[in-house]
Amino acid sequence: MSTLTTSEVSGFIVFHIVLFEPEIPPNTGNIIRLSANSGARLHLIEPLGFDVSEKSLRRAGLDYRQLTHMQVWPNLQTCFENIQPPRWFAISTRGTQRYDTVQYQAGDTFVFGPETRGLPKALIDECPEVQRLRIPMLPDNRSLNLSNSVAVVVYEAWRQHRFIGGQ
C-alpha cells in the first residue's frame, strides 16, 4: 500500500474523506463519484456493510472507480498512520463548530460515521473540540444523507481554495 501524505498533487488540493464503517452501498458509490470529481482521496474503514464489488456500489460509482484514489483499511488507526493527516475533523450532528467557519488546509481529513448511527462518541471525544464539525439543519431533524454531507463539506473546503485544479 502506498502512503498518501502529499497534500497537493498535480495542481490539486488534496483532502481526505474517511468513511468509518459505511453501511449503504449507493451512498459509498456516490462518494466514489464525488472523490473522482473533486480529487479527494477516499478511505473506507472496516467493517463495511457491503462488499466493495457489490453491484449497487458499482452502479452508483459508475465508471468513476478507476478515477478515484480509494483504499480500504482495517481500522482508523492504520488509516491515520498511513495518510498522516495534519488535521482531522469529526463530522457529526453532535459537532460543536459549524463546518463553514473553518479555514481548511490542504491535507485536511474529514471523518464521517455510518449512516444509521453516526460516529461513536468515544471517537468524537478524541477529536479536538474545534474540529468537531456539524452541518446546520432545521430543528427536530435527525440527520442529512451521508453522501450529501460529504459533498457539502468537501466542496466548501475546495471552494476556499478557489476550486484549484477544477474547471
Task: Outline where the language-model segments fall.
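Post-transcriptional modification and biogenesis factors for structured RNAs
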Residues: 1-167
